[in-house]
Regions:
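Substrate-binding groove of N-acetylhexosamine-processing glycoside hydrolases
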Residues: 45, 54, 98-116, 123, ...
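Substrate-binding cleft of carbohydrate-active enzyme catalytic domains
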Residues: 1-169
Length: 356
């Protein structure tokens, strides 16, 4: 459960209440939107609801990047960023930052019974250049005999890995952690960059427990049909047939075989919702691709049959209709027209693409 990001902090932390009340303010279309977040009581209710249905919720508190919302609430812990990604990082040079983040993780660990705790670690490069001139980070480099800000990032992640493990949790993080040489024991790597299959191979070769969740085809905020206009389309779209064909369709491209996957714990699809502003939009992007994900996760390649899957989907569509789920109907794309999404552009880089 991705509870924090640059755009918002969505969980109550008792010791640092401004994380939610200030870090939870605003959205893409209105920076003055009142704070929206989950109270710890609401979190407990959701966990109980999930447990009754045999679902385990794993929390993610992203660090040291994607910290803009948190830094709006407590700027004294900011490590800076860039014009495009302001106040993007936590300050890894301040000892107070480690106390602050440890206290946050203690509350998270006490709240969530899952043995896993995700602390992100992705895309720190978006803000790391600010560390080159930050006096606290520079003092850390000198004190610890480090040469580069990348080594400061490694220092930070090693310390926070120890914190997570001290709380009795297994660390989960994105595939950038492979560059930081975190220990293999009690660590799970989430491989998300489909255009960097070498990171998958490195994770498996080094013996890390690995979850495969590459953007293509498992990011469900990506467009799923050629005529859809809203959604990410960076280098193609993610149709249901590709989700069903995952992962065996890409073995040759990745340079792996089924026998290499002994360390893979499973697969995961990610639905990033910072630009999904209605329930219908979320449903439309998740269903029916979620059904293909489920079958891919529990089916060996030798027993997969896409035509039979499509036949079974007829019962799923009947259920979706009964539950009033606004799904994408690949049988008749006009059955549920594509819900409009916001169009967000930054300079020349398209963040949320719209196709005329």
């Amino acid at each position: 459960w991705h509870l924090t990001d640059a755009q918002g902090w969505r969980i109550e932390i008792k010791q640092y209440p401004k994380l939610a009340t200030i870090g939870g303010e605003g959205c893409h279309s209105d920076p003055d939107t009142p704070a929206q977040y989950y109270t710890q009581e609401q979190i407990r209710d959701i966990i109980a609801y999930a447990q009754e249905r045999h679902i385990e919720i794993i929390p993610e508190i992203d660090m040291p990047g994607h910290a803009t919302a948190a830094n709006k609430a407590y700027p004294e812990y900011s490590g800076g960023g860039t014009e495009e990604h302001p106040e993007f990082t936590f300050n890894v040079g301040k000892e107070e930052t480690y106390t602050y983040l440890t206290n946050i993780l203690k509350e998270i660990a006490a709240l969530f019974p899952s043995p896993y705790l995700h602390i992100g670690g992705d895309e720190v490069a978006y803000g790391i250049k600010a560390w080159e001139t930050d006096p606290h980070v520079q003092a850390l480099l000198k004190r610890e005999g480090l040469q580069t800000v990348k080594e400061a990032e490694r220092y930070f992640m090693h310390r926070m890995t120890d914190v997570v493990n001290s709380l009795g949790k297994t660390l989960v993080g994105w595939d950038e952690l492979l560059d930081l040489n975190v220990k293999q024991d009690n660590t799970i790597i989430m491989w998300w960059r489909h255009d960097k299959p070498d990171y998958l191979r490195r994770s498996l070769t080094k013996g890390y427990s690995t979850i495969m969740c590459p953007r293509k085809p498992l990011y469900f905020d990506f467009v799923q049909y050629k005529d859809h206009k809203w959604g990410r389309i960076w280098d193609g779209f993610c149709p249901i047939e590709d989700v069903y064909a995952f992962p065996d369709k890409w073995f040759a491209e990745w340079g792996v075989s089924a026998s290499d996957l002994s360390h893979v714990k499973g697969i995961q699809a990610n639905t990033w919702t910072e630009l999904m502003h209605t329930k219908d939009r979320v449903d439309f992007m998740i269903f029916p691709r979620l059904c293909a994900l489920a079958e891919s996760a529990w089916s060996a390649p030798t027993v997969k049959d896409y035509d039979k899957f499509l036949s079974r989907m007829e019962d799923a569509f009947t259920l979706f209709d009964k539950l009033n789920i606004y799904y994408f109907d690949y049988r008749n794309p006009q059955h549920h027209p594509e819900p409009a999404g916001p169009v967000i552009k930054k300079k020349e880089k398209i963040q949320m693409d719209f196709r005329d």
